[in-house]
Amino acid sequence: PGFGFSVAVMTIVARSLGQGKPDRAERFTKITAGLAFVAMSLMGGIFFLFAESLTRLFIAEPQVVYWGSLCVMVAAFEQPTLALAYVFAGALRGAGDTRWPMYVTILGVWIFRMPLVYICVHVWQFGIVSVWVVTALDFLLRSLILWRRFAGGGWK
């Protein structure tokens, strides 16, 4: 759903700005962010509550189900921030500010996530769950940066 909200807000922002209505673009972005946050928080709740059942849909080996369930539980917590990162990136893209979402994605994946995952797994030996924790932190970081860029209003 996050990607769908991103595409929807991108279209609404582009159309609103094309009509000379930046306040409308801002209002609909905030509404879309709220809807996406709620929808993906609910999905996260489902992930968390049914982590083991969801994991068992793909594999039955007990140890893999155990570790997979833990990863799904962590993924549950990244859903709200993933929603916000997608929505604010979409809003900025719709406004023609395409570089910031690209820069933030590069920063998040290649400067933050990959090195930290490497350190967590190979240096600190935290294991597979740490990969998911770092990914959740990456989306939190991205959502905060993109929200700040959007809130700054320079895209108007």
In which residue ranges do the predicted regions lie?
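Membrane-interface helix-loop junctions in multi-pass transport and translocation proteins
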Residues: 51, 57, 65-66, 109-143, ...
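Small-residue-rich hydrophobic transmembrane alpha-helices
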Residues: 1-51, 82-104
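Alpha-helical transmembrane segments of multi-pass membrane proteins
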Residues: 1-2, 62-88, 107
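Hydrophobic alpha-helical segments typical of transmembrane helices
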Residues: 9, 67, 76, 88, ...
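Internal alpha-helical transmembrane segments of multi-pass membrane proteins, especially GPCRs
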Residues: 27-38, 69-77, 103, 107, ...
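Transmembrane helix-loop junctions in multipass membrane proteins, especially transporters and channels
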Residues: 8, 52-61, 91, 95-98, ...
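Hydrophobic, well-ordered secondary-structure elements that form the walls
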Residues: 18, 25, 54, 68, ...
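Alpha-helical transmembrane segments and their lipid-water interface positions
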Residues: 2-6, 18, 43, 117-120, ...
